[in-house]
């Protein structure tokens, strides 16, 4: 897993890596170019993103995106791809488009459970596995010179 974002988001990336507690999770926030980000996202099986530029990069590259909307709305800035799972609560107070919750509760994001995000990711993996062509196992031919 790779965590992407700006240099300002590096501490958040560090938190994600700490919670994941795996050497297979890398924080690349602030150390990649835009070209690097496009390459990394296009090679990914799935991208998890808030409503940001990276969400739309993932959509443009054809990578399945799990799009998390809080204070913004998928009605205004949807991922322009059929390969998207949108998580949005549509509360009475949203969309407010504020960077800080004006009501102080941040329910629009807090009510999207981590388990819901992970379920969406696992559904993508399961669909990819079902779509893979399965061939019968055969013994390998001996190598001949």
Q: Can you name each region flagged by the protein language model?
A:
Residues 1-70:
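Donor-binding and catalytic core of enzymes assembling or modifying cell-surface/extracellular glycoconjugates
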Residues 8, 32, 72, 91-93, ...:
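Residue-level detector of flexible, active-site-proximal loop/helix-junction positions
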Residues 19-20, 41-44, 72, 100-103, ...:
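Alpha-helix boundary/capping residues
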Residues 31, 59, 78-80, 95, ...:
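Non-catalytic, surface-exposed connector residues within folded enzymatic/regulatory domains
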Residues 36-38, 76-77, 95-97:
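Short, charged, surface-exposed secondary-structure boundary motifs
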Residues 61-89:
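Gly/Pro- and small hydrophobic-enriched strand-loop and loop-to-helix capping segments
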Residues 82-145:
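Leloir-type glycosyltransferase catalytic cores
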